[in-house]
């Protein structure tokens, strides 16, 4: 089962390694799951650490160390079905990548995703993913 892990879950997992987001993050790295990431998410994680979390740079290094465990998926430029349900246009590249990769789940804490009427991939919160 393919899981696209959103930026907010990655950052929460890195900052609180014993928290619920970290548990979901590490669960997604284990079979039967296949963790997915796109260049947009990688760039966003790096940018947020540079802009707001510079004091935690060592935690960013941890992410970069485990990045080879993820499958890097393409980020299509074309509009995809379901985009009209996303309020924040900055989230569209993530949805496009998840759809192009055939992701089963999008693991996120982003309310714009969680409240959107998107059927595929299944949008799940940390708590929902931990219950799978």
Which residues make up each language-model segment?
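Metal-dependent nucleic-acid phosphoesterase active-site entry motif
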Residues: 1-18
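PIN/NYN-family metal-dependent endoribonuclease catalytic core
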Residues: 5, 21-51
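Alpha-helix capping/helix-boundary segments
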Residues: 9-10, 41, 112-113
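Domain-scale selection of a single, long terminal region
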Residues: 39, 43-81
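Active-site neighborhoods of divalent-metal-dependent phosphate/nucleic-acid chemistry enzymes
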Residues: 71-106, 111
């Amino acid at each position: 089962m393919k899981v696209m892990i959103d930026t907010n879950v990655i950052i929460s997992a890195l900052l609180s390694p014993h928290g619920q987001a970290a548990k979901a993050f590490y669960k997604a790295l284990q079979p039967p799951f296949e963790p997915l990431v796109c260049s947009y998410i990688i760039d966003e994680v790096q940018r947020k650490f540079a802009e707001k979390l510079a004091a935690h740079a060592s935690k960013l290094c941890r992410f970069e160390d485990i990045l080879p465990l993820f499958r890097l998926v393409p980020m299509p430029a074309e509009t995809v079905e379901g985009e009209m349900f996303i309020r924040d246009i900055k989230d569209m590249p993530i949805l496009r990548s998840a759809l192009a990769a055939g992701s089963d789940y999008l693991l996120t804490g982003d309310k714009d995703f969680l409240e959107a009427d998107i059927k595929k991939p299944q949008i799940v919160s940390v708590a929902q993913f931990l219950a799978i």
